[in-house]
Regions:
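N-terminal strand-loop-strand
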Residues: 12-51, 55-56, 77-78, 101-103
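Nudix hydrolase/Nudix homology domain
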Residues: 45-49, 91, 111-149
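The catalytic Nudix box helix
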Residues: 51-85, 99, 107
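Disulfide-bonded cysteines in secreted/extracellular proteins and peptides
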Residues: 8-14, 65
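Short, small-residue-biased leader/transition segments that mark boundaries at the very start
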Residues: 1-9
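Active-site-adjacent beta-strand/loop module that shapes the phosphate/pyrophosphate-binding cleft
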Residues: 87-109
């Protein structure tokens, strides 16, 4: 049998300990003048729009992951990538790490397998947003607060 704890699962017979792997994902709020980039992923359950997100690959830094995911999913380049915060993410046992980045160039060309829509929005024409408790919504609310000043 297995005995569980918060950190690991231990096999009672052989004593082997198994630590769950953690999947790290990034979330990035891309700013362009007085607008922010919002996308709708095909796997979203609902009609809301959110921020570009993706999983960290072995051997890359979090900042490299941010730049790669934005480029892959939208065709855009970003700069001034800065840490915002993080949130435990229950599925698939992960950690979501949020970043803010500035638009650096390119035209939006969506990765159609992943995204059904994406565009820059000003505070006056925002589409439906993610739920309040999500890291994405906290980041968007922060941007709304900052862009108002």
């Amino acid at each position: 049998g297995l005995v569980g704890s918060e950190m690991c699962i231990r096999d009672r017979k052989c004593g082997r300990e198994v630590y769950p792997s953690i999947s790290t994902a990034i979330l990035v709020l891309v700013r362009k003048e007085d607008s922010l980039l919002l996308v709708h992923a095909r796997n979203f359950k609902g009609t809301f729009n959110s921020l570009v997100a993706g999983f960290l690959e072995t051997g890359e830094t979090l900042e490299e992951c941010v730049a790669r995911e934005v480029k892959e999913e939208t065709g855009l380049d970003v700069t001034n990538i800065t840490y915002f915060g993080n949130q435990a993410w229950p599925y698939p046992s992960g950690l979501m790490v949020g970043f803010i980045a500035d638009y650096a160039g390119g035209e939006i060309k969506l990765q159609e397998e992943e995204l059904s829509s994406g565009d820059f929005y000003t505070r006056d024409n925002l589409p439906e947003l993610p739920r309040k408790l999500s890291l994405a919504r906290k980041m968007i609310d922060w941007w709304l607060e900052c862009s108002h000043k």
